Amino acid sequence: MSIALSSLIEATKEDEGLLRQILSSFSCNKDEDIESFLHSRAVEFESLSKARTYLICDENQLMETNFCLDQIVIYGYISIALKILSVPYDVSNRKRKEIDGLSAKIHGEQIKDFSCYLIGQLSKNSSVQNNDISGAELLQAAYDVIMAAVDAVGGRYVMIECHEKEKLMQFYAVNGFEEISHIADGKCPMVQMIRKIANA
């Protein structure tokens, strides 16, 4: 099950040390930025409504401990936000129309910017022994949150931004994402990938 960080903040408002303890139990040995975000920035992003973060936990384990906060085990986490996808000029009008749903142009000009749901963070907890939660399960948790938003306000595409690494890009490709653009980021180039939301 997923626990909204906003709910955890509310539950620990009398004990900020407990909140820090829970969040600091997460580690990611593959990407320090993912770990740092949860430890240092997720709460601020939550308060500013820049992103919503969800902790993935074991519902049975929570019930066994009577939802005791200091015994929460984080198996993974996801963060979701809204973001504008700026499509490169070399992307075809056919693709632009597919993304927009109606047209490739507005007032005779190519549509360049599209609103998307961004899965900004997605990772399992390296510090949990025998943590068998899969990337596909984390993606499904993200989709569940996004679909609730889609039902309320609409939306056509989900976007991710990941390091330009073959294994990582292949994971997202297998799960329905396609490359749309690249981001120059010094020594760590990034790629943007998108996936159409079902029934959009």
Can you name each region flagged by the protein language model?
Residues 1-130, 137-159, 167-200:
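Non-catalytic substrate-recognition and accessory regions of acyl/acetyltransferase enzymes
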Residues 162:
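His/Cys-centered metal/cofactor-coordination and adjacent catalytic loops
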